[in-house]
């Protein structure tokens, strides 16, 4: 791999990490600003779930596909092909963005009525309509902006994407938090106005990101024009042929990108109905916020970290499959699954074990939040497994099954959600998500087994071993936590920080030691870990 590509990948990974970090930790001041307005988080999420789905459909995976397309033709010196697609793509993304905005804005009352099912709820249809309309403006600009990122990435120029992502998050979060503070504390406005300003921040952040990308465009344009002059001109590809190739490539990414938002949408349109059926309409808005906003933000942490590591092996799977090297392909699949489980399982388990101080640390003490986080945390393993199995299917050119497995999982979620919520309240929604994702993953695993002729014997053995290491870690953490809570309260913020730092730190050290002692880490991460183990004189 060239040093330029390694540097670019590092820059992009760093930018993505900073962006995700900011996207997680803003919820601490966000929750603090909404004290006395607990319905604010629910209202925010009611607007954001439809927006995420509309945004995914509006972009249709085109920016990522353009990145691959431009890279492919640049590699053979056909620079004009990529530029032609870029110009056309900008027009297309502008049109799809505007159309998506108009549809979302016009149909906001219908989406709101699908969400709010009872007059006893704290939040009204009118409030949800206002918030959905406020966030819909971002659709005008984000697809257009995303395509420019894709074009730069296709030229192995990751800096513009990384910098624009960070700028977008900083501006969005600053506007979001500042807007809530000004509306509630200075203007003495309503929580609806405050949350409308908060969701409109997506548009403002998008503008800032676009500004950064335009600056990069003018800075890099002389170099890009030089490449055009070197164009070989051997390939004459029509826009129809280009988009045919792009659509074939992007459809699976659309569905994978939609997986989590669609599961959340099922909750949004069924949760309040089920809660009203069992007489819990008054608390359903708060329970929804705990489920789909507060705990979900925490559950996604281990997913983001683990998939970032394991996904780096996916291109190797694609290469070995394309070249017919099945032995290398199977070894890469082994490695992908093992790294995923090695990282995700302890993170999810730690989140479940320390659910009460973690929830208090990020938000405030809440028995419902603790309960939901404890049961929801292990689902992170399923989120990560679905993303990685879907990527492997893409690597072995069987991506059509990703769509099938997701639809089956969604159907199960839709069928089971209301009955399970009636039986177990908010926990029922977590259980329905677990079942839906588990079945979707089983389908993906079966397809991998059949078409990659992959045997899961090693993974099953390794999973049991990783489970044993985690059981040992959990035992130590539970004993330590039991002792510490006699002196520290997980219901207060500062003491929760101490609990999480000590228990989490000791748990991580125990797991790290056991993985070194057993030489599991050596097998997964190679010589560098072996050298560390030797220096520490472990094993």
Segment roles from a protein language model:
Residues 1-25, 80, 84, 234-257, ...:
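N-terminal membrane topogenesis motif
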Residues 4-64, 72, 101, 105, ...:
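Signature of the first transmembrane helix
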Residues 72-89, 290-377:
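Specific pore-lining/lateral-gate transmembrane helices of multi-pass inner-membrane transport
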Residues 101-123, 185, 348-364:
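Short membrane-interface helical motifs at transmembrane helix boundaries
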Residues 119-147, 365-389:
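Alpha-helical transmembrane segments of multi-pass membrane proteins
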Residues 141-164, 378-406, 423:
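Membrane-interface junctions at transmembrane-helix termini in multi-pass inner-membrane proteins
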Residues 159, 173-216, 410-442, 449, ...:
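Membrane-interface helix-loop junctions in multi-pass transport and translocation proteins
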Residues 479-539:
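Membrane-proximal transmembrane or re-entrant/amphipathic helices at the cytosolic face
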């Amino acid at each position: 791999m060239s040093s330029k590509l390694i540097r670019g990948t590092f820059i992009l990974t760093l930018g993505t990490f900073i962006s995700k970090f900011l996207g997680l930790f803003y919820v601490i001041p966000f929750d603090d600003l909404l004290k006395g307005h607990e319905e604010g988080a629910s209202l925010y999420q009611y607007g954001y779930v439809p927006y995420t789905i509309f945004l995914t459909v509006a972009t249709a995976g085109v920016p990522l596909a353009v990145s691959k397309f431009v890279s492919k033709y640049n590699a053979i010196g056909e620079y004009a092909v990529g530029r032609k697609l870029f110009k056309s793509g900008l027009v297309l993304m502008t049109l799809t963005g505007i159309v998506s905005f108009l549809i979302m804005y016009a149909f906001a009352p219908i989406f709101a009525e699908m969400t709010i099912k009872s007059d006893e709820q704290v939040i009204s249809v009118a409030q949800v309509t206002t918030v959905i309309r406020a966030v819909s403006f971002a659709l005008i600009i984000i697809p257009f902006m995303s395509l420019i990122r894709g074009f730069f990435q296709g030229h192995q120029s990751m800096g513009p994407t990384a910098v624009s992502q960070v700028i977008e998050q900083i501006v969005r979060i600053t506007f979001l938090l500042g807007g809530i503070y000004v509306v509630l504390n200075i203007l003495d406005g309503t929580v609806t106005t405050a949350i409308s300003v908060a969701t409109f921040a997506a548009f403002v952040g998008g503008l800032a990101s676009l500004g950064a990308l335009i600056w990069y465009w003018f800075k890099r344009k002389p170099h890009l024009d030089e490449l055009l002059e070197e164009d070989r001109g051997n390939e004459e590809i029509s826009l129809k042929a280009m988009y045919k190739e792009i659509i074939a490539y992007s459809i699976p990414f659309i569905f994978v990108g939609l997986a989590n938002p669609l599961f959340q949408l099922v909750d949004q349109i069924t949760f309040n109905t089920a809660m009203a059926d069992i007489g819990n309409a008054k608390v359903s808005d708060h329970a929804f916020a705990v489920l789909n906003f507060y705990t979900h933000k925490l559950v996604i942490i281990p997913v983001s970290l683990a998939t970032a590591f394991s996904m780096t092996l996916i291109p190797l799977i694609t290469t070995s499959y394309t070249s017919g090297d099945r032995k290398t392909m199977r070894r890469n699949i082994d490695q992908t699954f093992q790294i995923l489980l090695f990282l995700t399982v302890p993170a999810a388990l730690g989140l479940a074990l320390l659910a009460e101080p973690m929830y208090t640390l990020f938000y405030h003490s809440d028995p419902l939040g603790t309960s939901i986080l404890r049961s929801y945390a292990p689902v992170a393993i399923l989120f990560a497994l679905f993303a990685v199995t879907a990527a492997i299917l893409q690597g072995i050119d069987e991506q059509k099954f990703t769509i099938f497995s997701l639809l089956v999982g969604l159907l199960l979620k839709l069928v089971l959600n209301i009955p399970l919520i009636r039986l177990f309240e908010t926990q029922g929604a977590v259980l329905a998500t677990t079942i839906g994702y588990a079945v979707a993953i089983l389908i993906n695993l079966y397809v991998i087994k059949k078409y990659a002729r992959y045997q899961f014997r090693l993974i099953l053995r390794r999973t049991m071993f990783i489970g044993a290491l985690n059981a040992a870690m959990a035992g130590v953490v539970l004993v330590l936590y039991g002792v510490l809570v006699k002196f520290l309260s997980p219901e207060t913020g500062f003491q929760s920080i101490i609990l999480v730092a000590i228990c989490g730190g000791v748990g991580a050290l125990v797991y790290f030691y056991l993985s070194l002692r057993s030489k599991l880490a050596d097998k997964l991460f190679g010589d560098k870990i072996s050298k560390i183990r030797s220096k520490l004189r472990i094993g």
